[in-house]
């Protein structure tokens, strides 16, 4: 009932005891639930755990860095020279391989775990531990090769103008070697393949090697010079491997020119060989034939060969497709003699009474090297007599010494 109704019937209403009320909360107090408190304590425990984990990881990292440094020092000690050079033959599994040593034996060896397996290709050069023969390193392709390219500062300082005569030979060499490297689109427009190889043959001293030097000096292509006898090695298989190295190096640095001097050392006609040395030389020739057939025309690799004995070369090497152009270097005729004499003597201080036509008209068969030797000897005669001018008598004496000197007559000691 309400307070007014109670008063009407004479009953006083109950008074509210304000002392029993709780005091009001201050405005600055926040009611924190128990869920938030639990979350806070959980996060604090997780933070403490993460800090412990961080300290543990830092300590473990320091230990691993020490182990890595120790392992690197151990690898350096293992890979320290001297090491044995071998050849990778076949991978057995991830940790073992078969390698060949320079002694001709094959070994089943362990492979260092840190080596990049992508570099281990059949035929690549590897380094073997001296005692265990374990494969500890992969060598660069040219590390054990004796075949080197001529650096720009090593190229001979010879131009075509320094070679007297040989106009036709110069033109043929430039058409077969230089033109395909500099203007290969001409052959594509005509629809023909450029020559792959050139054979220069003729008597000694007729300018074959000198013309090859001029080609090396006047082209921007990489130039690789080898002598045929370099391919003949002591151990079986070394010669064919060197042939492969030459053509591999030429392909990697194309456009390039390979000049093989004295090719008759390895390219004589094949026969029924009775000795191991003869069979090895024939294997070198077979590898050379295979490489000349195998390299792609687009690699811009040209081959120049020189020999004094073209009649002894194997017919398989001379066929078109391998050596497309054969250039003869004969003994100089009268016109060529005049050009050679003029070229060589252009750098000499000759007397006004010297008439080179006198020596040009002589019928003796002499080569360009003989003419150069005559002029050099004439200069030495002038030096001997303390003169700065070469006289006619100097050239005459030099001509007799070089051309008409009897091998059993040593006039120097008379």
Swiss-Prot record:
Molecular function as annotated in GO? ATP binding; ATP hydrolysis activity; proteasome-activating activity
Per the record, a Pfam family? AAA
The record lists ATP as bound by: 202-209
Fetch the InterPro entries from UniProt. Answer: 26S_Proteasome_ATPase, AAA+_ATPase, AAA_lid_3, ATPase_AAA_core, ATPase_AAA_CS, NA-bd_OB-fold, P-loop_NTPase, Prot_ATP_ID_OB_2nd
Where does this protein reside within or beyond the cell?
A: Cytoplasm; Nucleus
- Any one of the GO BP annotations: proteasome-mediated ubiquitin-dependent protein catabolic process
The UniProt keyword set, sorted, is: ATP-binding, Cytoplasm, Nucleotide-binding, Nucleus, Proteasome
Per its database record, what is this protein's job? The 26S proteasome is involved in the ATP-dependent degradation of ubiquitinated proteins. The regulatory (or ATPase) complex confers ATP dependency and substrate specificity to the 26S complex.
Would you tell me the protein name for this molecule? Probable 26S proteasome regulatory subunit 6B
What is the originating organism of this protein?
Caenorhabditis elegans
Q: Which gene encodes it?
A: rpt-3
């Amino acid at each position: 009932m309400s307070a007014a109704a109670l008063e009407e019937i004479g009953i006083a209403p109950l008074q509210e005891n304000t002392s029993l009320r709780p005091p009001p909360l201050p405005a600055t107090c926040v009611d924190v639930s128990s869920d938030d408190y639990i979350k806070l304590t959980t996060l604090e425990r997780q933070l403490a755990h993460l800090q412990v984990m961080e300290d543990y990881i830092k300590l473990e990292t320091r230990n691993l860095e020490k182990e890595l440094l120790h392992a690197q020092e151990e690898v350096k000690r293992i890979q320290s020279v001297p090491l044995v050079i071998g050849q990778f033959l076949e991978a057995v599994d991830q940790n073992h391989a078969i390698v060949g040593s320079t002694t001709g034996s094959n070994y089943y060896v362990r492979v260092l775990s840190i080596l990049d397996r992508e570099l281990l290709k059949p035929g690549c050069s590897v380094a073997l531990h001296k005692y265990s023969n374990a494969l500890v390193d992969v060598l660069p392709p040219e590390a054990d090769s004796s075949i080197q390219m001529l650096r720009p500062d090593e190229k001979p300082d010879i131009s075509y103008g320094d070679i007297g005569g040989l106009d036709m030979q110069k033109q043929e060499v430039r058409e077969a070697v230089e033109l395909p490297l500099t203007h290969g689109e001409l052959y594509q427009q005509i629809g023909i393949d450029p020559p792959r190889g050139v054979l220069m043959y003729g008597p000694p001293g007729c300018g074959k090697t000198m013309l090859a030097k001029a080609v090396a000096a006047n082209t921007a292509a990489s130039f690789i010079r080898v002598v045929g006898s370099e391919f003949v090695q002591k151990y079986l298989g070394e010669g064919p491997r060197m042939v492969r190295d030459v053509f591999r190096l030429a392909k990697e640095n194309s456009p390039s020119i390979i000049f093989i001097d004295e090719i008759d050392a390895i390219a004589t006609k094949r026969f029924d060989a009775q000795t191991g040395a003869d069979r090895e030389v024939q294997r070198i020739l077979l590898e050379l034939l295979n490489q000349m057939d195998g390299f792609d025309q687009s690699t811009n690799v040209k081959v120049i060969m020189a020999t004094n004995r073209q009649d002894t070369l194997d017919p398989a090497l001379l066929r078109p497709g391998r050596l497309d152009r054969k250039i003869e270097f004969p003994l100089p005729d009268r016109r060529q003699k005049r050009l050679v004499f003029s070229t060589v003597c252009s750098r000499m201080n000759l007397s006004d009474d010297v008439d080179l036509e006198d020596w040009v008209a002589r019928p003796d068969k002499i080569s360009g090297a003989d003419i150069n030797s005559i002029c050099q000897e004439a200069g030495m005669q002038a030096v001997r007599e303390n003169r700065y001018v070469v006289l006619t008598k100097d050239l005459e004496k030099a001509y007799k010494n070089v051309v008409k000197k009897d091998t059993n007559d040593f006039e120097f000691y008379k």
